[in-house]
From Swiss-Prot:
Lineage: Eukaryota, Fungi, Dikarya, Ascomycota, Saccharomycotina
Boundaries of every SPX domain copy: 1-145
Residue span of region Disordered: 564-610, 616-635
Site feature (Important for inositol polyphosphate binding) residues: Y22, K26
Organism: Saccharomyces cerevisiae (strain ATCC 204508 / S288c) (Baker's yeast)
UniProt miscellaneous comment: Present with 2630 molecules/cell in log phase SD medium.
Protein name as it appears in the record: Vacuolar transporter chaperone 3 complex subunit 3
Alphabetical list of Pfam families matching this protein: DUF202, VTC
Protein's membrane topology: Multi-pass membrane protein
Region (Important for inositol polyphosphate binding): 126-133
GO cellular component: a single term: cell cortex
Main function: Accessory subunit of the vacuolar transporter chaperone (VTC) complex. The VTC complex acts as a vacuolar polyphosphate polymerase that catalyzes the synthesis of inorganic polyphosphate (polyP) via transfer of phosphate from ATP to a growing polyP chain, releasing ADP. VTC exposes its catalytic domain VTC4 to the cytosol, where the growing polyP chain winds through a tunnel-shaped pocket, integrating cytoplasmic polymer synthesis with polyP membrane translocation.
Length: 835
């Protein structure tokens, strides 16, 4: 399609006069005169050149001014919305419907602005190329356009990421504070409550991958933002960007943020970026805050025969991959991770799982580790961890991981062969790992191999290319043809945790997105496989097998919305007819089979399903559960399942038992009296225990502070014990002193044991989110009683002896006399304790 026709079709009517006047600029080029066969020199003069440049500059000013005004208008709306969320009083006055409508308008405007920028930017590039092609005798206008684009930072951001993050924050506010029916689907809203996986590695998952054209990327992000918040990298991540929850759903807009020139400007700019403030009126206003999407670099390993590539492409179960990965520039000394991943796929269910070995490396040790099988870094790291008090089991596991990867590199003769760089945007509900959407854009593949011994691309003695990672502006401009490949689309991946053998969860918005014209599904797509195929696929010496999706890259994946809608309708009708046939077959099978056999088969099926779910949810065996299974199966064989009133009450949220018993209680009698239907299982986790454990720091500190206080009491009692015991010979009552020393000694032991036991008990209750009381009064009461009794005994014995001496029962001539004022008090105490 000609660009002029595309521009006319994609123009947003209310903004029609603000687009580039492409047809007028074409007329100024006198294209028709050139096509008539006249000489370019005769028909094109300096005056024509000046008129064209002046018109081009005016069009730039017009488009840029309009774009700035609209962008700032959206910013003002977002500022007003954010202002209404800053205090509790303002939040109470918010009209949720009006708030949501304004937010929808901002998202819609941002989406239209992105399309506006793309169309106009493409128009300016094409008209400049047309000028240089038609009038080669005149200086190229490309350099002029480059200068003007730096002065007028038009379309400098490849994506409106800062706007999207602010909108995402406001959508999250709306979801959290208002039960709006259109804000998020009910199924998605309940996901965070039902998800109880504390670690993604504990469950299998399904992965769905799609290609997204650059023209549709903004609309795709806008659709996702209505249901999932964007995950903002508050800092440079240093762990697994796929599974570690190292992200914050927060927007940190810096008022003095600078401008970031996007990748489209790189075709015109040698340095690839520019920083500039833009003055509007009398005050400076930030046009594009910096993007939060991190640049991830991955260095893949393989051997001369590309065995890892072939094994992965042929879907050999357990085929491993090895990669080095870091975020940002290597000169900034980021955390570098060496990762060995082994994916396994269940061919029956389609579920995927993986095992991963991850080592954090230092750049200066990588060469010796990879090429010389040097264990010095392993020994250095283990010694450091041992000095810090790391447990022996962890050190042994770390040593095994080092040996595993080193042996893998040596046995397979691996070396770095391919570099992939991309920007990642992630969408996920914080704390809920059941569904996650990532979009990787600006994907670039670069050869990093030394397969050709005569002309190696990478120094064979170094693990990475020094020319790319050097401290020079835009080092990619030095790449030669054939050394790099730009992937034309963005890659969207939807990862869904499988709690059973079901297919993709019934999220309507996901179905609408994945079946729309905006995305093109590519099952089993892999960044590594695509990179090897694009850079090494033409050389039969290296690669003889290619991925099935390569031919699709030669076609335009964009679809007509109407055609995509009709195709989706046909697909849904076909699926519905298949489901109807299957349901009919199930009904017929139930009628034809006797009741007893049907019940027995259904019971076996339910038990198998329950075993599968137990494998996903509980990784610890239980003897009690093992002995109870035969009893449950016997009950199933003796009864035929009926959908009774109690089950309907459960679904309705009413009284869940007709006899007053709770079928979900721990009582085995009441639980066995109620039989759940197929596919419904007894909950094993409370909703309050779903998700990761998040307890305020003051709770942990209070428990530790109490333990420390008990330790101080234990220390004081031990000092008292040994002081008394060491001074027994000097005491006036040696037997009493000896007895008290032993009493205090046992009291000291009790305090230490009691303190540690209480600390562990409270720690368990805190981690388990238990509602039980944390008080433990027995210990303090017992210590207080023992101390009081010993003091009273010591006091009584001492004063009895003093009374005897005072009354002449013992020779007291050597005792000093008391003042006359204290004599009545002494007599009272003597009478109280007796003689």
């Amino acid at each position: 399609m000609l660009f002029g026709i595309k521009l006319a079709n994609d123009v947003y009517p209310p903004w029609k006069d603000s687009y580039i006047d492409y047809e007028r600029l074409k007329k100024l080029l006198k294209e028709s005169v050139i096509h008539d066969g006249r000489s370019s020199v005769d028909s094109w003069s300096e005056r024509n050149e000046s008129d064209f440049v002046e018109a081009l500059d005016k069009e730039l000013e017009k488009v840029y001014t309009f774009q700035i005004s609209k962008y700032n208008a959206v910013l003002r709306k977002l500022d007003d919305l954010e202002e209404n969320t800053k205090s509790a009083e303002k939040i109470q006055k918010i009209n949720s419907e009006q708030f949501k409508n304004t937010l929808e308008e901002c998202l819609d405007e941002a989406q239209r602005l992105d399309n506006f920028d793309r169309l106009n930017f493409t128009g300016f590039i094409k008209i400049v190329k047309k000028h240089d092609k038609l009038h080669p005798n005149y200086p190229s206008v490309k350099s002029l356009l480059q200068v003007r684009l730096k002065e007028l930072p038009f379309n400098n951001s490849e994506e409106y990421s800062p706007l999207l993050y602010r909108i995402s924050y406001l959508y999250e506010f709306l979801r959290s504070n208002y039960d709006h029916p259109n804000t998020v689907s009910k199924s998605l809203a309940s996901t965070s409550k039902l998800s109880h996986f504390s670690n993604l590695e504990d469950a299998s998952f399904k992965s769905y991958k799609f290609w997204v054209h650059d023209d549709n990327i903004m609309e795709v992000k806008a659709r996702i933002l209505r249901h999932l918040p964007a995950l903002v990298y508050a800092s440079v991540p240093n762990e697994n960007d796929d599974f570690v929850d190292n992200l914050e759903s927060d927007v940190r807009v810096q008022p003095e943020a600078r401008l970031n020139i996007g990748s489209k400007s790189n075709s015109l700019s040698s340095d690839g970026n520019s920083n500039q403030d833009v003055e509007i009126g009398k005050s400076k206003s930030v046009i594009f805050p910096q993007s939060y999407d991190p640049t991830i670099t991955t260095l893949y390993f393989d051997n001369d025969f590309f065995d890892l590539y072939n094994n992965r492409l042929l879907k050999i179960s357990g085929a491993p991959t090895l990669r080095l990965r870091w975020i940002g520039k290597l000169l900034d000394k980021p955390d570098i991770f060496l990762e060995k991943r082994t994916f396994t796929e269940n061919t029956e269910t389609g579920n995927s799982s993986f095992e991963e070995i991850r080592l954090q490396m230092k750049a200066k040790f990588i060469n010796n580790f990879i090429f010389k099988n040097d264990p010095s870094y392993k020994n250095y790291l283990i010694n450091q961890l041992r000095e810090r008090g790391t447990q022996k089991e962890e050190l042994e596991k770390l040593s095994r991981d080092f040996d595993n990867i080193q042996n893998f590199i040596v046995e397979e003769k691996l070396q770095p062969v391919l570099r992939a760089t991309y920007n990642r945007t992630a969408f996920q509900i914080p704390g809920d790992q059941s569904i996650r959407v990532t979009i990787d854009s600006n994907i670039m593949y670069i050869r990093e191999d030394s397969l050709d011994k005569n002309r190696p691309i990478r120094n064979p003695e170094n693990w990475h290319r020094d020319d790319i990672d050097s401290n020079i502006p835009n080092p990619l401009r030095f790449l030669r043809a054939g050394e790099y490949s730009k992937f034309p689309y963005s890659v969207m991946e939807i990862k869904v945790i499988n709690q059973d053998n079901s297919q993709m969860p019934n999220y309507e918005w996901i179905k609408d997105l994945t079946n729309s014209h905006l995305v093109n599904e590519v099952p089993k797509f892999s960044l590594y496989l695509q990179g090897v195929a694009s850079l090494f696929g033409e050389d039969d010496k290296y690669v003889n097998i290619l991925p099935f999706w390569l031919p699709d890259l030669e076609t335009d994946i964009r679809k007509n919305p109407q055609e995509a809608y009709e195709e989706e309708k046909k697909t849904l009708q076909k699926q519905k007819s298949i489901h109807d046939k299957l349901d009919n077959m199930r009904r017929l099978s139930k009628i034809s089979v006797p009741d007893g056999k049907t019940t027995e088969r259904q019971g076996q099926k339910d038990q198998n399903t329950r075993h599968v779910i137990a494998d996903l949810e509980d990784h610890e065996s239980s003897d009690e559960e093992g002995t109870a299974l035969p009893k449950k199966s016997a009950v199933k064989k003796g009864k035929k399942f009926k959908t009774n009133a109690a089950f309907l009450k459960i679904l309705a949220g009413k009284n869940i038992s007709e006899n007053g018993n709770d079928p979900y209680s721990d009582d085995t009698d009441s639980a066995s009296s109620f039989q759940l239907p197929p596919g419904v299982k007894k909950p094993v986790h409370l909703l309050k225990n779903a998700g990761p454990v998040k307890v305020e720091a003051k709770v942990w500190l209070a428990n530790e502070r109490t333990f420390n206080r008990w330790l101080s009491v234990t220390t004081l009692l031990s000092v008292l014990t040994f002081s008394i015991y060491n001074s027994v010979q000097k005491a006036e009552f040696p037997q009493l002193a000896d007895l008290l020393a032993y009493v205090y000694f046992f009291l000291t032991l009790f305090c230490g044991v009691w303190a540690y036991r209480t600390y562990l008990k409270r720690l368990t209750l805190i981690k388990g989110r238990s509602g039980k009381h944390l008080d433990a009064p027995v210990g303090p009461i017992l210590v207080a009683v023992v101390l009081i009794v010993t003091l009273v005994v010591n006091f009584s014995v001492a004063f009895k002896e003093a009374a005897r001496r005072e009354r002449g029962l013992v020779n007291v001539s050597s005792q000093p006399s008391l003042p006359r004022t204290l004599k009545p008090i002494q007599d009272f105490i003597f009478n109280l304790v007796g003689e």
